[in-house]
């Protein structure tokens, strides 16, 4: 299991075409704070049918987009 597996599962189960989560929500779901390694781990999300659409440091949010 990867560092963010719980988050990827959450996004997949949600099933929305687009899902916006705050850094705090991601912390609650994944059990860890979002850090720079997220940029490397986000590639794993493709296996779950999603990709990271936008990371906003100003708003402290991440938008996940369904592939296809």
Question: Where are the model-predicted features located?
Answer:
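Ser/Thr/Pro-rich, acidic low-complexity intrinsically disordered regulatory segments
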Residues: 1-17, 32-68
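Alpha-helical residues within the helix-turn-helix
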Residues: 28
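Short acidic, hydrophobic short linear motifs in intrinsically disordered regions
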Residues: 18-25
